UniProtKB/Swiss-Prot annotation:
GO molecular function terms listed in the Swiss-Prot or TrEMBL record: (2E,6E)-farnesyl diphosphate synthase activity; dimethylallyltranstransferase activity; metal ion binding
Gene3D superfamilies assigned to the protein according to its UniProt record, in alphabetical order: Farnesyl Diphosphate Synthase
SUPFAM superfamilies: Terpenoid synthases (SSF48576)
Residues reported to bind isopentenyl diphosphate: 52, 55, 90, 107
Catalysed conversion reaction: isopentenyl diphosphate + dimethylallyl diphosphate = (2E)-geranyl diphosphate + diphosphate; isopentenyl diphosphate + (2E)-geranyl diphosphate = (2E,6E)-farnesyl diphosphate + diphosphate
Alphabetical keyword list: Isoprene biosynthesis, Lipid biosynthesis, Lipid metabolism, Magnesium, Metal-binding, Transferase
UniProt protein name: Farnesyl pyrophosphate synthase
Enzyme Commission identifier(s): 2.5.1.10, 2.5.1.1
InterPro entries attached to this UniProt entry: FPS1-like, Isoprenoid_synthase_dom_sf, Polyprenyl_synt, Polyprenyl_synt_CS
Stated family: Belongs to the FPP/GGPP synthase family.
Major enzyme class: transferase
Pfam families for this protein: polyprenyl_synt (PF00348)
Species: Ganoderma lucidum
Binding site for dimethylallyl diphosphate: 106, 194-195, 237, 254, 263
Length: 360
């Protein structure tokens, strides 16, 4: 199983150098100076590969499930290219996000803007990662009937993510703690816009367009997919927030920092919803401080308030809700109405199985 997963990743990884060469060839063809070409190559190599690649690989997985067969070389390349475009989008977000948050490390290495000699040039570097998406889409998909849908999908998703980022930045600035701005409703808004659209809806919608799934005036398959994937993305982020507090660092692979970073996390919002006035004071006095003892006091309060049990109950509710939504997709072999295009439950089950009760 692990071997199959490693092979799948390797096959996906092998597409990246081809895309990098196309992008660098474009700069060379435009007569750009060699130092600019080298800089762009370094930007690409440092920021695009190297993550978990879940978003990118899920485009390929979804195309395979929708087609119901192995992909030929051309189909695989096109699906992987779209997957890599999602990874380019993620890189664009992360490079700029790290600057806004003044983060120190990302994926076990210094954030790009902290690399010697980069500094604020990282702003333009992030723009170039975004621009690369549209160069690749035009080069490989311009003649496809769904090309405009791909463009709109990337543009819409980018704007949605930026709106989510704005709400997050003004709700929870690192240098000014004001828990009165926090609420579970606001947390939900941030999560849906900042994470769920680009991490969950985008990869599946890309797969649907490539497989020729059309929009429909009634029972639109894209609206149906979104109605399942947005709650799925919300559940994923709540899980992420909980693991930041509850998972041991050696399992999580990093040290959780949501408390000291004043993050508008599900945990603090769940605590605020349950806290007595005295407990609320503990949160007000200790949350968002760069102080180990203050962090320990917040964690102790989470334990006292039963945040672990609260999360376990949330997880079961979320799972049951998402399973129920998936079951609204007609089962294979069932009759579908005229004009309805068959979505496959398996696309969504694959996502849910990957994240249900995960430990990291």
């Amino acid at each position: 199983m692990a071997d199959a997963k490693a092979q799948k990743r390797q096959k996906f990884d092998n597409v990246f150098p081809k895309l990098r060469e196309e992008l660098l060839a474009y700069l060379n063809q435009e007569g750009m100076p060699q130092d600019a070409v080298s800089w762009f190559q370094r930007n690409l190599d440092y920021n695009v590969p190297g993550g978990k690649l879940n978003r990118g690989i899920s485009v390929v997985d979804s195309v395979e499930i929708l087609k119901g067969r192995k992909l030929n070389d051309d189909e695989y390349f096109k699906a992987a290219l779209l997957g890599w475009c999602v990874e380019f989008l993620q890189a664009f977000f992360l490079v700029s996000d790290d600057m806004m948050d003044q983060s120190v490390t990302r994926r076990g290495q210094p954030c790009w803007f902290r690399v010697e000699g980069i500094n604020l040039i990282a702003i333009n570097d992030s723009f170039m990662l975004e621009g690369a998406i549209y160069y690749l889409l035009k080069k490989h998909f311009r003649s496809e009937p769904y090309y405009v849908h791909l463009l709109e999908l990337f543009h819409d998703t980018t704007f949605q993510t930026e709106i989510g980022q704005l709400i997050d930045l003004i709700t929870a600035p690192e240098d000014h703690v004001d828990l009165s701005k926090f609420s579970l409703a606001k947390h939900q808004k941030i999560v849906i816009y900042k994470t769920a659209y680009y991490s969950f809806y985008l990869p599946v919608a890309l797969a649907m367009y490539t497989c020729g799934v059309p929009h429909a005036p009634a029972n639109d398959p894209y609206a149906l997919a979104q109605s399942i994937l947005i709650p799925l993305g919300e559940y994923f982020q709540v899980q992420d927030d909980f693991l930041d507090f509850a998972a041991p660092p050696e399992v999580l692979g990093k040290v959780g920092t949501d408390i000291v970073d004043n993050k508008c996390s599900w945990c603090v919002n769940a605590a605020l919803a349950r806290a007595s006035p005295a407990q609320r004071r503990v949160l007000d006095d200790n949350y968002g401080l760069k102080d180990k003892e203050a962090e320990a006091r917040v964690k102790a309060l989470y334990e006292e308030l039963g945040i672990r049990d609260e999360f376990a109950a949330y997880e079961e509710r979320a799972y049951a809700r998402i399973v129920g939504l998936i079951e609204t997709i007609p089962a294979e072999g069932a009759d579908v109405g005229a004009g309805d295009v068959r979505l496959k439950r398996e696309v969504f089950k694959a996502f849910l199985d990957k994240i249900y009760k995960r430990q990291k």
